[in-house]
C-alpha cells in the first residue's frame, strides 16, 4: 500500500468541486440534474478577449514567460488598480499567477510559518482554511450570522488578535454569502489592523465587478494599511474566464518577490496566451461587462424572491458575487421516509437525490446552518431548481 503524505490525508477535498463532479456523474447516468454548485459564470468569454488571445498566437507568444508575468501585463494590472480601485501599485509589485487560487497559496506560503494564526471570517471560501493548514498555520474562524449580513465587527477582530496572529484572509464581495463591506466598515477594520504589529491582510477581490448595492471597496485604499495589505484579483469571474486561469496580486515589494520565488519553483509564469487575453480584460472599461452584472442582479432578485416563499428558510439580500446563502437549520431533525436531515450536508445530499438539484453544504464554508446556491445559471433553470427545492423541502416532516 502506498503511503501518501500526511499533509494530503489531513486535507479536505474541495466541497464545491466534489459536488460538481457528483453532478456531472449523475448527468452522465441520464439524471436531469440542475447544478447550482459551482462558482462559474454561464456567459461566454467576450469576443474582444478571445481576439486578443488569437493575436497572441499569431504573434508567437509561445515561449517561456517571465515568472511574475509579462512586463506589459504587469503594467496593465497596475493601471487597472489605479483606475478601478485608486491603488498605486508599481509593476514590480504585481505578480501574475495561474489563477487567483495560486496567488493565494503563493502568499500563504510566503507569509505563514508553522504555528502562525490566520484569522478567517466565516463563512469563507472553502480553499482558505485548507491552504492555511497546508502551510502549517492555524485558521482562527470568526463566526458571523445572517442577522448581521455575515460581517465581522472591529471589536470581534480585535478580540481575536493574539501574539501568534499573522494574517487576516477574507473576500469582498464574499464567496459564499454575497456580503459586500462598505467603505466605512472596511475603514473601521483597517484601524484595528493598522494598530497591530506584524499583521497583514489578504483581501480577495475577485468579485469586485459583480457588486449591486454599491461599488465594491478595496481594503488597501486606506493609507494606514496600504503597506500591510495584499490585494488578490483575477479575470475569472467578471470576464467569464474561469478556464483561462489568470489571477494576480498587488503587494509590498518584499512579498511580491517572495511569491515570485515560490512560483518559480512551482509553475513558473502563467500561460502566455492566457496572459494576452487577460491583458485585454484588465485594460477594458468595466462597462464592457455591464450586461453580465445586470443579468446577475436580475437573477439575484429572482432567486431571493422565490426562496422567500419557502417556509422555514431564512435569507438575506446579498450585495455582490453570484450566490445566496440561506439558513436552513429549521429543517434539521426532519425526515422524508427513511431519509433524516441532521445537518446542512444531509440537506444538500437530500436535495440532490430528491430534487435533482446540486448545491453545496455550508459546513464546507464554515457555517453548518446554511447552504450555498449559485445563481450563475439561466432564469429558466433557476425557476425550475427553486421549484424543485421547494417541493422537496415541503416533504420533510
Region roles according to the model:
Residues 2-4, 8, 12-14, 19, ...:
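PLP-dependent class I/II
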Residues 24, 78, 82, 108-109:
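Generic structural signal for well-ordered alpha-helical scaffold segments
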Residues 37-40, 55-73:
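A glycine-/small-polar-enriched, mobile loop at the entrance of the PLP active site in fold-type I
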Residues 64-97:
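Conserved N-terminal alpha-helix of the aminotransferase class I/II PLP-enzyme fold
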Amino acid at each position: 500500500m502506498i503511503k501518501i503524505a500526511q499533509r494530503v490525508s489531513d486535507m479536505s477535498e474541495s466541497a464545491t468541486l466534489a459536488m460538481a463532479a457528483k453532478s456531472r456523474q449523475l448527468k452522465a447516468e441520464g439524471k436531469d440534474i440542475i447544478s447550482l454548485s459551482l462558482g462559474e459564470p454561464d456567459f461566454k468569454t467576450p469576443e474582444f478577449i478571445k481576439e486578443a488571445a488569437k493575436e497572441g498566437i499569431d504573434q508567437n507568444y509561445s515561449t517561456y514567460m517571465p515568472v511574475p508575468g509579462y512586463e506589459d501585463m504587469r503594467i496593465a494590472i497596475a493601471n487597472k488598480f489605479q483606475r478601478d480601485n485608486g491603488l498605486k501599485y508599481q509593476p514590480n509589485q504585481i505578480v501574475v499567477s495561474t489563477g487567483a487560487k495560486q496567488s493565494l497559496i503563493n502568499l500563504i506560503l510566503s507569509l505563514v510559518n508553522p504555528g502562525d494564526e490566520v484569522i478567517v471570517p466565516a463563512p469563507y471560501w472553502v480553499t482558505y482554511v485548507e491552504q492555511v493548514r497546508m502551510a502549517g498555520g492555524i485558521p482562527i474562524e470568526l463566526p458571523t450570522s445572517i442577522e448581521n449580513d455575515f460581517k465581522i465587527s472591529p471589536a470581534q477582530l480585535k478580540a481575536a488578535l493574539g501574539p501568534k496572529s499573522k494574517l487576516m484572509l477574507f473576500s469582498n464581495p464574499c464567496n459564499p454569502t454575497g456580503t459586500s463591506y462598505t467603505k466605512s466598515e472596511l475603514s473601521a477594520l483597517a484601524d484595528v489592523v493598522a494598530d497591530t504589529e506584524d499583521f497583514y491582510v489578504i483581501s480577495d477581490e475577485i468579485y469586485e465587478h459583480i457588486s449591486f448595492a454599491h461599488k465594491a471597496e478595496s481594503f488597501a485604499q486606506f493609507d494606514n494599511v496600504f503597506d500591510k495589505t495584499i490585494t488578490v484579483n483575477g479575470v475569472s469571474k467578471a470576464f467569464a474566464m474561469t478556464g483561462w486561469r489568470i489571477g494576480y496580486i498587488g503587494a509590498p515589494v518584499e512579498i511580491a518577490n517572495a511569491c515570485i520565488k515560490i512560483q518559480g519553483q512551482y509553475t513558473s509564469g502563467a500561460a502566455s496566451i492566457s496572459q494576452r487575453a487577460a491583458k485585454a480584460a484588465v485594460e477594458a472599461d468595466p462597462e464592457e461587462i455591464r450586461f453580465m452584472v445586470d443579468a446577475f442582479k436580475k437573477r439575484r432578485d429572482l432567486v431571493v424572491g422565490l426562496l422567500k416563499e419557502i417556509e422555514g428558510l431564512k435569507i438575506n439580500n446579498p450585495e455582490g458575487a453570484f450566490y445566496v446563502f440561506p439558513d436552513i437549520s429549521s429543517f434539521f431533525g426532519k425526515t422524508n421516509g427513511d431519509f433524516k436531515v441532521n445537518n446542512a450536508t444531509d440537506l444538500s445530499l437530500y436535495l440532490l437525490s430528491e430534487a435533482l438539484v446540486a448545491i453545496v453544504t455550508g459546513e464546507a464554508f464554515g457555517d453548518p446552518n446554511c447552504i450555498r446556491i449559485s445563481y450563475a445559471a439561466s432564469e429558466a433553470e433557476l425557476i425550475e431548481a427553486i421549484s424543485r427545492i421547494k417541493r422537496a423541502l415541503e416533504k420533510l416532516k
